[in-house]
Amino acid sequence: MAKRRGGRNVTGVLLFDKPAGVTSNKALQQVKRLFGARKAGHTGSLDPLATGLLPICFGDATKVSGFLLDADKRYVVTCKLGVATDTGDAEGTERDRAEVPALDEEAVERGLTGFRGPIDQLPPMYSAIKHQGQRLYDLARQGVEVEREPRRVEIYDLQLVAVRGDELELSVHCSKGTYIRTLAEDIAQALGTVGHVCALRRLGLGPYQDPAMWTEEMLAARAEQGREALDATLLPMDSALQQYTGVELADDLAYFVVQGQPVFVPKAPSEGWLRLYDRGGNFLGMGQALDDGRIGPKRLVARR
């Protein structure tokens, strides 16, 4: 008989403020233990050096976490010029040095122009991408470097916040799959030097833009007030899906959807993902518009 997973049933999304020096998985496990939750998952890793928004999905909300993995992100990043590291950030070992040319805001702005819109990035060796079944970062730690194919990403917005000596502070709004470390290195090269990320903070992800976040200390204080106070920090799972159109279903249609059957909904959108609700406003899950005009249920949540 399979061993029953311990913990309690908790459902919702926590907007966690990850501290520096902690891996995303370690942060997840710490928060999961604090909630005593049976099931939880994060929505895409932040580098250990990075701080900021790490949405953690509990219970049924893990079924919609993939939509956040595909979402756009916003960061504030500080790039240290003149020194390159093997990891592309301050946690790595120095691998190169170069003089930093005299830079003012106008010169930096000229350098940034080529990094707005669609760009191709070469994934760093210190990344979770797999090569013949092995993570690139595992190969990198063995001193092995392999060829990587460039990947197309999009920089929706890139702004210079400040120039402070040999450091640049930038705000970045980018598509999924963008490596900020690679972006910082490429910008440094465009400015005639080398560089690495020395500070990185994620401020937004998908529908969550500049949200209130919870630190581990804040959560611990809530936990001392009891489970009800702790659970009040969670957002409903459909908060992660506000970029998609919501559709209210009549009672008979909601019944069929819950059974996993496609339904025809008059005047519903004819393409894309859709949030599905019953007449009581209860979130049923995600559906997808089908070619025949019906809505097919794809990610249903448990009925209680």
Swiss-Prot record:
Responsible for synthesis of pseudouridine from uracil-55 in the psi GC loop of transfer RNAs. It catalyses: uridine(55) in tRNA = pseudouridine(55) in tRNA. PANTHER family: PSEUDOURIDYLATE SYNTHASE TRUB1 (PTHR13767:SF2), TRNA-PSEUDOURIDINE SYNTHASE (PTHR13767). GO terms for molecular function: RNA binding; tRNA pseudouridine(55) synthase activity. This is tRNA pseudouridine synthase B. Keywords: Isomerase, tRNA processing. Belongs to the pseudouridine synthase TruB family. Type 1 subfamily. The keyword Isomerase applies. The active site is at D47. It comes from Halorhodospira halophila (strain DSM 244 / SL1). GO terms for biological process: mRNA pseudouridine synthesis; tRNA pseudouridine synthesis. It comes from the Bacteria. Pfam families: TruB-C_2, TruB_C_2, TruB_N. It is an enzyme of class 5 (isomerase). The gene is truB.
